Each structure stands twice: as C-alpha cells, then as structure tokens.
C-alpha cells in the first residue's frame, strides 16, 4: 500500500477532486394551504443567506480562500450559491490529515481559518398536487484542485441538512508527479465514502455503495433506518389521523423515499 503522507511531489498537485452531495427531505402536507406553507418554510430555512453560511464553513473545513460569492433567491422558490475558492499553503500536518480516510468535523466544531476551485449549491422544492407528498432537494458540488479532499467537509454537510435520503458521488481526475517522475492518480487512501462518515451517521442511515475503484469513482447512498410518521407530517400530528388514513400516508411516504433511494419508479404492487 502506498504511504500517501510520504509522497514528495514535483511542483503543484494537479489532481482534481469532486464531491457531489444530494440531499432529500420528504414531507406530507394534506391541504393546499399546508403544502404552500411547507414550501415557504423550506424556502426560508434554506435561503441564499443560510446556504452561503453553510458553504463558507465548507470552505473553512477544506482549507480554502474565498475569492468571490454569488448568490440568488428565486421566485417563486429555490436558491443557489456559488463560491469561487483558491488553494492556499497547506502545512505538513494538514497534508497528512487529508491523506487519511476519516470523518471530518461536525458543525459545532468548525472554527475559522480560510485558504480550492468552486463550491455550489442549488435547492429544488417541489410537491405532488394529489397525494400530499412534498420533497425538498439540495444539490451541493465541491471541486478542489490540490492536496485537501472535499470529503473532509462531508460530515459537516450531512449534519447541516435534515436529510431523509442522501446520495454522494466522489471522483478524482488528472494526475500529479512525484520527484522521481512517477504519476499518481490519487493521493489519499479511500475504499468507500463511508470512511468519512461519523459513527452516529452510520447508525442512523442504511447505506449502499457502488464503487469503480480502478476509475477512482465512489458512490454511496443512504436512507434513514427509522420511520416515525410524526417527523413527516406538516401542520398536523399522527394523533389527528385515524388508523386507515395514517397507514395510507405512511405507504405514500415510504414509496416516495424508496423510489428516490432506488433512483427509479417501483411497481405499484411492490411492498415498500
């Protein structure tokens, strides 16, 4: 096994590391008024200002300098933020830490010190007009050129959003040379994105990996293990529902979540 912490590079580290992080929050809102209220709530909870704060903390975690911030709230709903970043000097200790496959910090652990390419986020609130199911999706992309991997921000991102389903894609492209001229197509150890998840996250979520190791492509998706109907009802409680209605709503929500997790529509007669 290559000891990535001891590779001496010739010139700049030319590897590009990209993390795509997609979260889904699912909700049931029975009436048209409740559905509108849910969309308004999500639109306010994850507006451009809040998303800018999250992405700025991501920049801090990966050790990047923020060069420019562009953000926009959209009408009727949705928001996007793009942050241009640049790599700064990386200490030997930071380089060694980035080569290790381990979870990054949690939101409460982030303290400031900034000095890679770009970070973007887009939000997509939507709702089903008949079955009452509403879904909020946020897409975050972190792309860096240099030593530190965007995976160090993964733990923070998961804890920053209230996510029912999460899909993550990580890839490394390009190569860098050591002082002897040998090419290195990856500069840190990894066999799964799960290496970077904290233990509490692994306990809360069921996970599935699809990895193409020889191409440096890693994919992990997660869905919450526990299902409590009250966590998904907007504007009412399960105590307000009779048993038949509660079971119907539960089936609608579980089907929505499993189809998002599977990435396809499931047969109508398939139990979920």
From Swiss-Prot:
Keyword S-adenosyl-L-methionine: yes
Domain of life: Bacteria
A Pfam family hit: AdoMet_dc
Active site: 117, 122, 145
Pathway: Amine and polyamine biosynthesis; S-adenosylmethioninamine biosynthesis; S-adenosylmethioninamine from S-adenosyl-L-methionine: step 1/1
Cofactor(s) listed: pyruvate
Top-level class of the enzyme under EC nomenclature: lyase
Gene3D superfamilies linked: S-adenosylmethionine decarboxylase
Record-marked site positions (Cleavage (non-hydrolytic)): 116-117
Pyruvic acid (Ser), modified sites: 117
GO MF annotations, alphabetized: adenosylmethionine decarboxylase activity
Keywords tagged on the record: Autocatalytic cleavage, Decarboxylase, Lyase, Polyamine biosynthesis, Pyruvate, S-adenosyl-L-methionine, Schiff base, Spermidine biosynthesis, Zymogen
Cellular component GO terms held in the UniProt record: cytosol
Enzyme Commission code(s) on record: 4.1.1.50
PTM section of the record: Is synthesized initially as an inactive proenzyme. Formation of the active enzyme involves a self-maturation process in which the active site pyruvoyl group is generated from an internal serine residue via an autocatalytic post-translational modification. Two non-identical subunits are generated from the proenzyme in this reaction, and the pyruvate is formed at the N-terminus of the alpha chain, which is derived from the carboxyl end of the proenzyme.
Cofactor binding, per record: Binds 1 pyruvoyl group covalently per subunit.
Catalytically driven reaction(s): S-adenosyl-L-methionine + H(+) = S-adenosyl 3-(methylsulfanyl)propylamine + CO2
Protein family (similarity comment): Belongs to the prokaryotic AdoMetDC family. Type 2 subfamily.
PANTHER family, A to Z: S-ADENOSYLMETHIONINE DECARBOXYLASE PROENZYME
Subunit structure: Heterooctamer of four alpha and four beta chains arranged as a tetramer of alpha/beta heterodimers.
Function according to Swiss-Prot or TrEMBL: Catalyzes the decarboxylation of S-adenosylmethionine to S-adenosylmethioninamine (dcAdoMet), the propylamine donor required for the synthesis of the polyamines spermine and spermidine from the diamine putrescine.
NCBIfam families associated with the record: SAM_DCase_Eco
Protein name: S-adenosylmethionine decarboxylase proenzyme
Organism of provenance: Halorhodospira halophila (strain DSM 244 / SL1) (Ectothiorhodospira halophila (strain DSM 244 / SL1))
